[in-house]
Amino acid sequence: MNPILINRLQRKLGYTFQQYELLLQALTHRSASSKHNERLEFLGDSILSFVIANALYHRFPKVDEGDMSRMRATLVRGNTLAEIAREFELGECLRLGPGELKSGGFRRESILADTVEALIGGIFLDSDIQTIERLILNWYQTRLDEISPGDKQKDPKTRLQEFLQGRHLPLPTYLVVQVRGEAHDQEFTIHCQVSGFSESVIGTGSSRRKAEQAAAEQALKKLELE
């Protein structure tokens, strides 16, 4: 690994690993090595969910469980994590196999998002829960300050459906047009057709559901509702 890139990443994270092998594992996709980051990702996913849930619970003492769940989903969803990964310039540090490198895996939202979760798991194992909680809250500070309860926290498919139903328009249709990759690491491409659009909008994701949500989000942006 390029030490300049690794040092830059650790500065952006606000954390220097004591166990360098944990950092390397967190950055390693399963296409590159059998010692990959999926177990760290599993751990990091749970830690992130806890930290964000705890922050929302204390920030919004009068908000009900439904709104808090929707806010948490917005903050921990794949495209939010991919945005954070790009802020860290994480793509340049990924360890990918030849196939993933050739297909542009360092830009794929699902890989970027999974790696952020793996880094969270790695930092926790390298330090303690207080340290990773402090870091996550720092990474999310602006997003936590800007988020608020309400309809905007409903998932994109629900919001698009409610918008169209409110105007007595047909519901959108979602069509899988491509599935790339092996069974354990697929990328779905969905075309979403919305009444009034001359062309379908496109969404991609690591599952059909995530790709449909991404397509719905693009439709909302086209309708200037996002």
UniProtKB/Swiss-Prot annotation:
DRBM domain span:
155-225
Residues annotated as the enzyme's active site: 45, 117
Give the location in the cell: Cytoplasm
GO-annotated biological processes: mRNA processing; regulation of gene expression; rRNA processing; tRNA processing
Top EC class for this record: hydrolase
Q: Which GO terms describe its molecular function?
A: double-stranded RNA binding; metal ion binding; ribonuclease III activity; rRNA binding
Which cofactor names does the annotation list?
Mg(2+)
Q: What is its EC number?
A: 3.1.26.3
Q: Which Pfam families match?
A: dsrm, Ribonucleas_3_3
**Positions of Mg(2+) binding:** 41, 114, 117
Q: Which HAMAP family match?
A: RNase_III (MF_00104)
Family label: Belongs to the ribonuclease III family.
What is the official name of this protein in its record? Ribonuclease 3
Species this protein is from = Pectobacterium carotovorum subsp. carotovorum (strain PC1)
